[in-house]
Amino acid sequence: MQQGKLLTWVLFILAWLAIESAAWGQYRIGDFEITGYYQYTINPSTGPRNPNNFACLTGPCSPGLQRKGGAPDFLLMRQFLDLNIYGKLSENLSITFQPRFFHDMTKSVDNHFRQYDSFPRNFRGQGNLLEAGGNDFNAELRQLYLDYKEGNLWLRVGKQQIAWGEALGLRVLDTINPLDLRQFVFFDRIFEEFDRIRIPQWFIRANYTIPNEAIPDLTGEFLLNPGAVVPTLLPAQGSPYNLVPAFLRVRENVNQGEPTVGGRVTGTVGDVQFSVNFLTKPNDDAVGVFKAFNGGCFAPPFNPLDCQVILDGRHPRIYTVGGSVNYNWTWAGAILRAETTVTPNAPFLRTIAATPTRIVERPVWKTVLAVDRPTYIVPGQDSMTIGFQFFETFTGGSRSALTDTFGSTVDQTAHVFTLFLQQPLFEKRISLELFTLFDTDDAHWIQPGIRWEIGNNVRLDLYYNEFGGAEKRPGRFGSFFWADGAFARVTFGF
């Protein structure tokens, strides 16, 4: 408790110093410019208990992985400080640092939970994250890279995140970086997409604009991670957002030295922007193959949690090709978007008698078709942004005894529709937002929200997540029914 109070005061003091500096303009130390924000988030729960924390082999058990049974009061309460330090070293060379500091207070304010590690990183090569901390506090050097620009060449070297594609809510082309799901899964404000939860990795990234007359902005991009592998980071078992049932234990088997290699060509022809993409990398999500069974629950003290199925979490190499097209439909005042990828060797599991025995490969084709259009709805106010998306996932080959990485049976096709509305008011001081996602197998995610810009440095976000539907297979949106809840964020920017 004393340590938690100390960390709280440290973050408040750092944030206060940063905010005070904003009153005098941009904060500088020599040639370095410092910007960033401090944020406080409260995410009370309105749903039932998370079944993953109570799923024992013998059936639901209470209190399971929690200190006491029942639905929690909070899913998350945290504060964090995000800094961006930029230095221009010469006309062509610059350097960027992005340190972040987290303090998770959820366990302190909600006695439903035992002590768990809020920032687990149990895999070979965890030093690649540049993180340090304890159960409640985490400090990381999230990004660290050099930028070099000379003529048509742009080079970025270091720990960085790379975003391809523009799909909202689901990833099609945006699969270069794994995701950090340890705190909030991906249920934060949807309009921010995955910017805050992509895990930056060590890349050499080079862009070269190819001189030509037909396509003046024709650009080739190459990226290489020489083998500093980081998998998807999941919440700890026993935590509010735990995704792994209590009777499972996944041992990450991450092979360092496996490179990530990719490239794309982008350009504009008339009203059409296009990209052609290629990427090969170890699969981000662990593919859990049966390794052992721990039968400790059959011996005194007969604790049902002591019976566990142990899975070997493997990360086989995948290859992905794809592309995108954006069309500026001037007559309709709309942007038409399309993204597609094909992964010929996506990993699945051969599951016999509920036991994943080996990895099998199947081709997977993902496509998103989208329309974005600004439309004047409220007289005297800015236009409303309206975005509609259609997602399809097609899995080829035999699906007999086939399960995905969540352990769910696999459909040949899965279809999802999304609608996003954003209405700015009062010179963009207030923004009303609504995101809706509907899975045609009967599942949904609805997120209404409001954003209020208070002055020049303070922002208040109020949102609500609601999940539901009859489709509750693990990994489908209906399975997150327990994650219903409001969240409020106060952000002080500088």
Residue ranges and their predicted role:
Residues 76, 279-281, 335-350, 356-437:
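Detector for outer-membrane/organellar transmembrane beta-barrel domains
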Residues 26-62, 69, 93-99, 183:
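Transmembrane beta-strand segments of Gram-negative outer membrane beta-barrel proteins
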Residues 30, 44, 73-79, 137-142, ...:
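Residues that define the transmembrane beta-barrel architecture of outer-membrane proteins
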Residues 81-87, 97, 143-148, 204-208, ...:
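Residues on the lipid-exposed face of transmembrane beta-strands in outer-membrane beta-barrel proteins
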Residues 32, 93-95, 152-155, 213-220, ...:
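Repeated loop/turn-to-beta-strand initiation elements of outer-membrane beta-barrel proteins
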Residues 40-46, 101-105, 150, 161-163, ...:
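Transmembrane beta-strands of outer-membrane beta-barrel pores
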Residues 93-240, 270, 465-471:
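Outer membrane beta-barrel
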Residues 480-494:
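Outer-membrane beta-barrel "beta-signal"
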